[in-house]
Amino acid sequence: MRWQSLFLFFMFWNALGLQGKEGEHWAFIPPQHHAPPVVKQADWPKNPIDRFILAELESTNLKPSPETEKITLLRRVHLDVIGLPPTPDEVKAFLADQRPNAYEVVVERLLTSPRYGERWGRHWLDAARYADSDGYSHDAPRVMWQYRDWVIRATNDDLPFDQFVVEQLAGDMLPNATAAQRVATGFHRNTQINSEGGVDREQFRIDSIFDRVATTGEVLFGLTFGCAQCHDHKYDPIKQVEYYRMFAYYNQVDEPRREIPTTAEFNEQKNHDQKVTELSAKVNSAEQGSDTRKKLEAELAKLKKARPRATTALVMMQRSSPRVTHRFIQGNFTRPAEVIKPGVPGILHSFPESESANRLDFARWVTSRK
């Protein structure tokens, strides 16, 4: 009976005119600076956030709870920051530390731990739909650990959030993109891969883009874009044509596997290439047509074929020949309608009108301070 209840609720909502005008909801209003409120118990707050909390408590005649005992505080911060309890030695050291900033010292120590990135990177990996297998009935293994490790390193390195997002949406399009920035685009290679027989490749490609648009909306905007795949959204201010404007960015993506060697693999390949160079020099110095040269040439050909392979990563790459994007009637890719140019939902901050706008432009718009 759940759907009947929802239907009646929305009928009631519309009948009373409660839906309001587009853009009036607080979520679509640019954030503003608010000075911390004045509080009565001025000696309790240790930072501006405490003042907001205390002001709310005082407005309801409530008082803050007393500070917990040190051992409980230590356990809480350990579980929050790195997901692991403190060791007996860490407990002893903290209980013996009588400095006023003893707690701050623990926090700094935990933030520099590799476990911090492993703990907090998981939250992003869940949102990025990270998995080590393809999904569907075959659910074959896939190599995605390089993207996972990139997220962990970015978290531990305190990578600025705008850079964190741009590299995942369009790292391959950055000037002189590094291997790590290309690996970051694995964010949108976490889509399911259907390796079953008889698969329509174009349908699967379109389904992957649908997933990328929906994920972008949910993770970065907090909006359910998926409904606008087939029609104007019923309760979020997103039109179907706006959905396909975002679709247009991901429609220009190819999905290669790229060699991203580990340090050990890189050194192994480097040593191999050095051997090829040395053997090539011997071939060139040997007499043309001689048996010695023929033997060296055979050895060289065999050596080149034996070049060590490196780990591959699923990444995104911008197409050299752009695709035309259409709006799909009822979300059906076999029913293309009008041609759509790249763009963004009108309810959000303005985007420069340009037919040449690409995924990097979109990524920078997403991370704009507006």
For the regions a protein language model found, what residue spans apply to each?
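C-terminal substrate/ligand-recognition segments
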Residues: 216-220, 226, 349-370
